[in-house]
């Protein structure tokens, strides 16, 4: 049984064998992965030790201050937060061995090819087609044609998680399959989408005759929607449930500005800041509780053969160790707080808060809410209630799958995708 003392010993051995001051960055990250200290809740041989997720903090604390490099999580967040848990749950052993190590070390960046111009909030209506070469029974490669949009990191990515329609003759949720797509395929074209900040974090991706071997399919043919739910639930936890210290993140910046500028204070702004501070702390503690629900290990699904399979559910009905719909609530809280805090900050700083004059076209590796000016935060936060699931859709998920309220009526449940009006 791996405990905190065992992890401290293993970390000390890693540092002794690979001193950060004299070890190449990539060599150190690979050694850390091989030692099971990358994500301790993953299985042995895949960067982990089958330990409780909560013990990752022990490893992080032991490495802090040693000069040990990190894997640049802001740059590879889609791989860490979405692709990795999906591959772990639904991938073959060969897929896990091939993809997880370079994903974690940052050698290979991942992106997500889900949303389409006509399938955003109604993602299951997607139209990108994947057709089996030689027919459904031939066992050949898949040829993919279509368009995806709002794709973060597509301009950096080596791989993409992709959902595409493989059967248009069944209802929309049942005709989808899930693939790993090679972003270097000559049929992949990435175009930047410029945002309100002037940057282009996002992209639109055109797929023309892209060839995907069947060995790069995750899950069974036609069960891609089930696989995608794991990705989406993990995405919302990754966005809304990131660990922050008390008074960290955007609320910390707002509080620091308040302390630094007494001449700008008013009673109304003070009361609003206090309310936002309390709400941010409630959200932080709720995130801690969610992580405790996930803390046993990710090995809680029948796919992984864990003794915990079928164990006690989280609040939203998912097994312990797997995110459930309650993660949607965390993402909702994050989006609302980011917008309200950034709005408060702009109002507090008056004309200085509106200063944002760098409209240079850039392709950043990620979002930097804490290292930029207030005007940037205000503009960028507007997208938080859209990306990763719109707040309106997430409210429906919380209502139906957490609170148990009646679902919205659906008229297309048994209608083949090809017969849906478009």
Which residue stretches match the model-derived regions?
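A short, Trp-centered hydrophobic/proline-enriched beta-strand micro-motif
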Residues: 106-114, 163
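C-terminal helix-coil-helix/basic helical segment that borders enzyme active sites and/or dimer interfaces
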Residues: 267, 281-308, 313-366
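Glycine-rich beta->alpha junctions and the first turn(s) of the following alpha-helix
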Residues: 188-285, 300-304, 308, 313-319, ...
